[in-house]
């Protein structure tokens, strides 16, 4: 039976450290300031944004929400980002995805000052991550949260075979880069990968981010592996579940993250920690 990695408790510990750092900055007369830009009225995005605001307020981070209509032009959004880039007391900028179809998300990401890119998606920051130059570099929050989990649970990465299933820019690619930087041998798999089970069964560390409920079954996992489930799916009964068949896989692994209370809580805590880091790096 695998040990459960408790993301909720770990996230609370990180929040506590972040609060201390916020207080230190405030003692120097500096208030960390996160600006979230929300375009349109996507209900899921509104929930995410509300959660970020609530967490920021709880930790003493100033948080501003900029709402824009779904029919604004791409240029109007780019001008708003430019204005935030030039606003001295704004330390961190986050544009909530997805954006309306007529707006190019890559252009928007490119427009954010890399020094204020709290999501770690700007090509400059992604390039630094792949070069292994991560000092003073914002990194995608979910993969960064997973690395914190490895550290906290003393999970050794060096020399291990790691398989990441899912190649998004938000999780898969930065996760692969972080594992590579930590001296793992990394395979990045995706929906076109042939004989996926042959790869996953070899993995000492398996990170799954496909968005497909119970995508990974017990016969696809190596005995004693570390399994990280990034999925947030709904099963046929509407119950929140992950990309891994937790109940059956848990019996075979050394460590596993549950859904909920696994990777999810870490992401928002890392976002707050990164807001504080961007503030410190700007002083």
Swiss-Prot record:
Function per UniProt: Catalyzes the oxidation of 5,10-methylenetetrahydrofolate to 5,10-methenyltetrahydrofolate and then the hydrolysis of 5,10-methenyltetrahydrofolate to 10-formyltetrahydrofolate.
Database matches in HAMAP family: THF_DHG_CYH
Family per record: Belongs to the tetrahydrofolate dehydrogenase/cyclohydrolase family.
GO BP of this protein: L-histidine biosynthetic process; methionine biosynthetic process; purine nucleotide biosynthetic process; tetrahydrofolate interconversion
Entry binding sites for NADP(+): 166-168, 191
Pathway listed: One-carbon metabolism; tetrahydrofolate interconversion
Recorded GO MF terms: methenyltetrahydrofolate cyclohydrolase activity; methylenetetrahydrofolate dehydrogenase (NADP+) activity
Record text on subunit structure and interactions: Homodimer.
Protein name, as recorded: Bifunctional protein FolD
Domain of life: Bacteria
Gene name as annotated: folD
Entry-linked InterPro entries: Aminoacid_DH-like_N_sf, NAD(P)-bd_dom_sf, THF_DH/CycHdrlase, THF_DH/CycHdrlase_cat_dom, THF_DH/CycHdrlase_CS, THF_DH/CycHdrlase_NAD-bd_dom
Recorded GO CC terms: cytosol
Key words of the record: Amino-acid biosynthesis, Histidine biosynthesis, Hydrolase, Methionine biosynthesis, Multifunctional enzyme, NADP, One-carbon metabolism, Oxidoreductase, Purine biosynthesis
